[in-house]
Design a protein with these regions (language model features):
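Catalytic histidine-centered segment of alpha/beta-hydrolase-like enzymes
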Residues: 292-302
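The serine-hydrolase catalytic nucleophile loop
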Residues: 47-60, 74
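N-terminal cap/lid segment of alpha/beta-hydrolase-fold proteins
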Residues: 1-36
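Conserved alpha/beta-hydrolase
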Residues: 61-81
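Alpha/beta-hydrolase active-site loop
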Residues: 54, 87-109
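Short beta-strand/loop motif that positions the catalytic acidic residue
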Residues: 261-263
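Alpha/beta-hydrolase fold nucleophile elbow
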Residues: 109-122
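Alpha/beta-hydrolase-fold enzymes
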Residues: 129-218
């Protein structure tokens, strides 16, 4: 018998000058447990994603295990405020996570502010690590299919390793310069990072990067992950922000708080998790899920879900 999916409480909270739209899955105090405090976990969505996709699946799974959980749309994205729509600002994304910690710590009855963890998925895996490095309120951090948007913009994509490419960097900066001096894209006019419909029609092409976007289209362009507010449109002025950002530069500062990085054995992004764990100090763990790729872990939780429960039960005890 399956457990019914809980109905979240829609809430908003501030992050810098923005108002973020969020869903709270709460275990509030009751008449029989008025002083009981529960640990809480923040779930942060992938680049071009929204809170109703993969983070909801992980939030409900962790909520069923006894945690209060919170999902939210990043500034400029989903139902949150900010223009240009779709802007990917890594430093604002990090602030959004810290703002979520503040909200849980100060505004949700029954949450133990000393036991707050974060799960970041894809690009948010990088943002979660960066936030934890400088925010001691985050007691534990876990990632699923982590990636670094800065690394992608400097090296030429997810499957190009960690070696920077001057030509790729130049293209990123030129695109941003042109947009800043020309069209002020809104959410409908900004270019798509990838066109899910076209990729699905064409069937993808060979090579690591192409296979990544084919798998992305199979998630974002089908019932698995399609959502009207997840448009994959990214203003070009995002790229000069991303080029100078490094998700994992300060991994060493997270210790002695624990780090768990979950990645698929077949994921083109696996090298990001490997490098991040190499840079981190104990306690740390790289957990590789056999037979799975990057996007498989977005909605196949049979291995990653229980692993996260075990990790946070120990880390937030």
């Amino acid at each position: 018998m399956s457990t019914p999916t809980p109905t979240p409480t829609p809430i908003t909270f501030p992050s810098a000058t923005h108002t973020l739209s969020a869903h709270l899955y709460h275990h509030p105090p009751t008449n029989t447990t008025p002083t009981t405090l529960t640990p809480a976990i923040i779930l942060s969505h992938p680049m071009t994603g929204v809170k109703e996709q993969t983070t909801t699946l992980y939030a409900t799974h962790l909520h069923a295990a006894g945690f209060t959980t919170l999902t939210f749309d990043a500034a400029y994205q989903g139902s949150s405020t900010g223009t240009p729509r779709g802007l990917e600002d890594p430093f604002q994304r990090v602030e959004d996570i810290k703002a979520a910690v503040t909200y849980l710590s100060t505004s949700v009855p029954g949450v133990d502010s000393s036991r707050i963890g974060v799960v970041g998925i894809c690009a948010s895996g990088g943002y979660a690590c960066f936030a934890a490095a400088s925010d001691l309120r985050i007691r534990a951090v876990a990632t699923v299919s982590a990636a670094c948007v800065g690394g992608m913009c400097r090296c030429g994509g997810v499957g190009r390793g960690l070696r920077e490419d001057g030509g790729v960097i130049g293209m990123s900066l030129e695109g941003a310069r042109g947009e800043r001096n020309g069209v002020n894209w809104d959410g409908e006019e900004a270019p798509k990072m990838f066109d899910a419909e076209r990729v699905l029609q064409d069937g993808g092409e060979g090579g690591n990067v192409d296979s990544f976007f084919k798998a992305a289209a199979e998630y974002y362009g089908t019932e698995r992950g399609r959502h009207e507010r997840s448009t994959q449109r990214v203003p070009l002025q995002s790229y000069d922000r991303m080029v100078v950002y490094d998700s994992f530069a300060f991994m060493r500062l997270i210790a002695p708080r624990p780090v768990l990085m979950i990645a698929g054995e077949e994921a083109e992004t696996l090298h990001y998790s490997e490098e991040a764990v190499r840079l981190a100090r104990e306690p740390k763990e790289l957990f590789v899920v056999k037979g799975m790729g990057h996007f498989d872990l977005y909605d196949r939780l049979e291995v990653s879900g229980p692993k996260l429960v075990r990790f946070f039960r120990e880390a937030l005890a």
